[in-house]
């Protein structure tokens, strides 16, 4: 019996662990960071995971969020399933070029063109596009203006920008205004944690997740005053996309938290109603940004399952 156990370990367990280890190492080896020039002196920080010949997934963060919003776990899970993952920092945020917005203003349509430029630079003809909050606006605009480049679309914690979407409660802006970062992580952390706890919704708040998220912001840039202010200004000329979304044929998933106090859940419901080929997922207790491991895992699993379901039958890029 003893030798049978030893034989099982030698013949099965050790080779399996070796193979799994090689697979993880290969994923790490296939991660690349680079800058992509999108306009004049503007360069965007871009991270890619996996084999560039595989079907692509483009992750688009929201205002005041860098690429770390999309976890390593999520990216690697998609690579293991045979996808090429791309995520990046928007202009004027994270590692990407900083801009004097008053001298060189931009809008969300320009941010949409940035996304297309990234795909072009990476020789990606089509991609599954996944956007959160403002990133959801960009994902929608990609599907509207560049339908030939979009395999499927996920719009999370976003809306159509219709006037019928209820505005955030006054408490939301009050909490935002109370947070006045000074580029000192230790001193500023308490203010950010208050904001993150509020945006988390009613689920149990995971402080460790929130601290890591905040630290990632400080590691990439100076954090002073209103975070992502230029991105908020960039949204000022957004129009209602209801009628444009109704014309889309792209497979779509709309994810929204039941307790989103920044973008009301009606924004997600209405977005799904506009899209002919869509599925709506409302996650109980989830707010605008999930700082709860269980809810975050659910959020990521919904993305993985949808992208897998809408994988193309051919291997052409």
Task: Explain the meaning of each model-derived region.
Residues 125-165:
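Conserved hydrolase catalytic core segment
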Residues 278-317:
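Catalytic active-site module of serine/aspartate enzymes centered on a nucleophile-bearing elbow/loop
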């Amino acid at each position: 019996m003893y030798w049978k156990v030893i034989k099982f370990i030698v013949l099965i367990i050790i080779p399996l662990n070796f193979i799994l280890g090689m697979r993880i190492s290969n994923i790490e080896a296939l991660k690349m960071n680079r800058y992509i020039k999108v306009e004049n002196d503007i360069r965007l920080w871009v991270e890619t995971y996996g084999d560039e010949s595989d079907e692509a997934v483009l992750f688009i963060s929201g205002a005041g969020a860098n690429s770390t919003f999309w976890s390593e776990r999520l990216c690697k899970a998609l690579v293991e399933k045979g996808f090429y993952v791309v995520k990046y920092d928007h202009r004027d945020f994270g590692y990407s070029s900083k801009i004097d917005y008053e001298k060189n203003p931009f809008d969300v349509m320009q941010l949409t063109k940035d996304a297309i430029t990234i795909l072009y630079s990476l020789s990606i003809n089509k991609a599954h596009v996944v956007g959160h909050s403002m990133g959801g606006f960009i994902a929608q605009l990609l599907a509207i203006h560049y339908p030939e480049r979009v395999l499927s679309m996920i719009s999370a914690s976003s809306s159509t920008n219709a006037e019928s979407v209820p505005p955030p409660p006054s408490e939301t802006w009050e909490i935002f205004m109370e947070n006045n970062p000074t580029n000192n992580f230790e001193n500023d952390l308490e203010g950010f944690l208050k904001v993150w706890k509020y945006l988390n919704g009613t689920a149990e708040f995971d402080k460790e997740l929130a601290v890591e998220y905040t630290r990632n912001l400080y590691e990439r840039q100076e954090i002073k005053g209103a975070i992502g202010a230029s991105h908020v200004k960039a949204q000022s000329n957004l129009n209602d996309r209801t009628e444009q979304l109704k014309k889309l044929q792209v497979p779509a998933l709309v994810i929204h938290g039941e307790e989103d106090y920044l973008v009301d859940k009606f924004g997600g419901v209405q977005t799904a109603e506009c899209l002919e080929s869509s599925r709506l997922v409302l996650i109980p207790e989830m707010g605008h940004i999930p700082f709860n491991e269980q809810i975050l895992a659910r959020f990521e699993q919904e993305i993985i399952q949808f992208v897998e379901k809408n994988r193309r039958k051919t291997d052409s890029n």
